[in-house]
């Protein structure tokens, strides 16, 4: 009888524990993306879902659709609804106005806030002790891309100088105006390549359209899209081609999505189709699955890897810290963190293929 009572007591205890466990609410991270349509952001979103799940967190994802007004209202609604942590891939980066408003919403409610990918200023992060940023160093991608371009051109210069004028003509697709990543990728990709070319006794790159004083073509919708690059490239090839002896000899893209669009236009003109077909070197940034496949198939030259998985790991750690009541930057020693501001840096890497 005594043994039976003990067994019954143990069963009741186990049932009580199970009921408590079942009743415990799963904490949630509210994640705000500047747009779902960005290829790299889609890879971050997929990786982050997994990392949050592995840490026992659920998530609600919001599509800003490229509108800061939409995103700010989404954040406001989430805060009003009792959000525990906000992960924000901000839409507008041209000024601090939007970030300031979002910080105000989070700070007034005491909700931890992490900006990611699209960088906000140090002043924004330091304005709230429960705010941080996870992303890359904006200039690094441009420098690495420029090095890749310089290395490749110097190894294949004569065959790439299609009209034999001793200079390489290029077209460059910029993802967005006013965005630090786009600004620095545009600037340093060309500057670094020129530095290497001139050190080797070669002439600097020449933008294909001398009437374009900006020396880039920008996605006017700020979406870094394949469609914008495809349209620009298709138009450019109607006047700059082999028949006119002024073929564009190099394509530089701020991201892999734009590289995909440019390659589609080149394919239509008989270039970059793989299997020994004539090819124009195309460089991107992100190392998306599509770009990796294009490089493998000989249709794209190289890209700069932006580590979506690494970014997701850092974001999930900070989200877990926030929901568990820990210091926001707890256990971040394995990451590269700026000395004077709570900014975690995810490194880039060159990628020419496996």
Residue ranges of model-derived segments:
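Hydrophobic alpha-helical segments within soluble ligand-binding/sensing domains
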Residues: 71, 132-165, 184, 226-233, ...
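Flexible loop/hinge segments that line or gate small-molecule binding clefts
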Residues: 102-140, 144, 156-169, 173, ...
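Hinge/cleft segment of the Venus flytrap/periplasmic-binding protein
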Residues: 55, 164-169, 173-177, 181, ...
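Beta-alpha junction/loop-to-helix N-cap segments that form part of ligand/metal-binding clefts
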Residues: 65-138, 256-259
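Extracytoplasmic "Venus flytrap"
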Residues: 28-47, 51-52, 60-77, 81, ...
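Short, solvent-exposed amphipathic alpha-helices that sit
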Residues: 40-54, 141-145, 180-207, 211, ...
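C-terminal motif of bacterial Sec signal peptides marking the signal peptidase cleavage site
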Residues: 18-21
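Hydrophobic alpha-helical
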Residues: 85-109, 113, 189, 211-292
